[in-house]
Amino acid sequence: MSGKSIFDKLWDRHVITGDEGQPQLMYVDQHYIHEVTSPQAFQGLRDAGRKVRRPDLTFGTFDHNVPTVNIFDIRDAISKAQIDKLAENVIEFGIDNASHGSDKQGIVHMVGPETGRTQPGKFIVCGDSHTATHGAFGAIAFGIGTSEVEHVFATQTLWQVKPKKMLLEFTGKPQKGIYSKDYILALIAKYGVACGVGYVVEYRGEAIDRLTMEERMTICNMSIEFGSKMGIMNPDQTTYDYMRGRECVPEDFDAAVADWKTLVSDDDAEYDKVIRMDVSELAPMVTWGTNPSMGVDFDTPFPEVRDMNDERAYHYMGLRPGQKAEDINLGYIFIGSCTNARLSDLQLAARIVKGKKISPNLTAIVVPGSRPVKRAAEKIGLDKIFKDAGFEWREPGCSMCLGMNPDKVPDGVHCASTSNRNFEDRQGFGAKTHLCSPAMAAAAAISGHFVDVRRMPEVQ
């Protein structure tokens, strides 16, 4: 009998009833909510006369609609209604939360790990497609729809069909200037946005082992852009060191670690699909089109038109085959989002811009992903470095990742963005998004166009 993967072990721990291959009822350990996908679910509970079954396993955040200049100046009526309704709902149903304006406020996929609620072995859901972020800790974590949010509220369970398993092994040692964002963008560019459909992706290999937890979260975050709603990594000493001392970790932390160590994949675990990628061959990545697979490394020209999707993307972006990333005339820079707004991301960008000025006629903003990150960054002077360089230093929130709050890219303007999606109109009507690492975004802010960060002395 073959061994089990970490996913197998966690799945088996959480099955309540049902046969494999059919929908199985799964127990949910942690339910994260935010203001956009929860209002209808709460109303469904009221209409049925139900309560939240386990408010102690539910945690709320305010992030998508929150302004980042004056966080309480919410002028859009729908955004304000969603914020106000979540504030009412968490009180009515007795749910702990990182309230709007509190010292814990931030993006849901940052607040969970920061508070220690995200832990190895847990089954985690949230009404948000980037919930796979939490899989970096050795948890099953994925996004759900609003009707499923209501089901979890009412029962603390969810019906799911077990997905197939993919092993994705990152090998080799990267060149300087290559980061985990480049790993995942290169993977998606090579294999497409549908490769992971129907699979849980287990990321493994020496290149993963060397990453910090913040870098690992970046990779798991974009599992959904690879087509998989779940990404997972084996917990290790890096995981435990990150978690130790955080607010919500188990009181007997050493005993918890002893259990977590049993959850890693067995050497003889079997997978339905295996992909290997050598990161030593990677160059800095930039997207040119309107989905995350439309990307190239800095050394490679944009591809020829292969189909109608390419033709439409080139038309929307105002680009053409044969151009290169350095030819893009940038007008905006966005460093933020649940993909790349952690302290290490801001430190990396600050090293590059320190003592310099952003290019004229360019707008550049930095949005820490949470208030703890903002405080930590200010404590070591990162805010001053960015402001001296001409960046706007904002309050935490989802910000310019999506056009759901005041932070939008103007129509027709190209933006270098550390976020996760480059769809048409994602950052605002007519916005032209180019996904990249924090290093590439910071360097582009200074030059006004993309440059090869491998050549910069500030880059390690």
UniProtKB/Swiss-Prot annotation:
EC number of this enzyme: 4.2.1.33
Molecular-function GO terms, alphabetical: 3-isopropylmalate dehydratase activity; 4 iron, 4 sulfur cluster binding; metal ion binding
Keywords carried by this UniProt record: 4Fe-4S, Amino-acid biosynthesis, Branched-chain amino acid biosynthesis, Iron, Iron-sulfur, Leucine biosynthesis, Lyase, Metal-binding
Binding site for [4Fe-4S] cluster: 338, 398, 401
Catalyzed reaction equations: (2R,3S)-3-isopropylmalate = (2S)-2-isopropylmalate
Subunit-level organization: Heterodimer of LeuC and LeuD.
Functional note: Catalyzes the isomerization between 2-isopropylmalate and 3-isopropylmalate, via the formation of 2-isopropylmaleate.
Protein name: 3-isopropylmalate dehydratase large subunit
Species of origin: Streptococcus thermophilus (strain CNRZ 1066)
Gene name of the record: leuC
